[in-house]
């Protein structure tokens, strides 16, 4: 076959292959990130009257029973977040390192063999939100243990920013250590829709004495 004819044949085959690939459905970063992220928000456990930035024995007992609740209700998290324990919080007029939330979620992290992301300040909700909105968690379960007023701010902001109703997120009562706020972010084709639901751990009434 003459060289020119060979070249024409090769060109025709190459053009045909390129056309065939062009007809295939494309996989874009947006489609790769489609899915539903479940963000489970829990408050720290019960605290002593003086605050101390710490849990009391009842809060400790709650934290020890939390892993079973999380696994049965939601499954095993892909990531766990708690505020930076080096941040100080004022309790009864005294400033203490704020370890309550981390102490609450630490048994869960240990039970599941997970690290705790604890590098964000307790009031830096914008930074926490940005981490939670990372497309790496598009199909993931994420557990967040935090201060209850900041959790309400976070949940309302997530709802507002993702086509949800921020007013659907109620105030978190000061005596409620059992609540679970669940925000789901459903991503599809570059759009994100948020939904909210409130649940309960079912762990009230734990012993007021610490385990031996």
Map each language-model feature to its residues.
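Sec/Tat signal peptide C-region and signal peptidase I cleavage site
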Residues: 26-32
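Catalytic-site microenvironment of enzymes
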Residues: 9
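Active-site-proximal alpha-helix that buttresses catalytic centers in soluble enzyme cores
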Residues: 33-139, 150-212
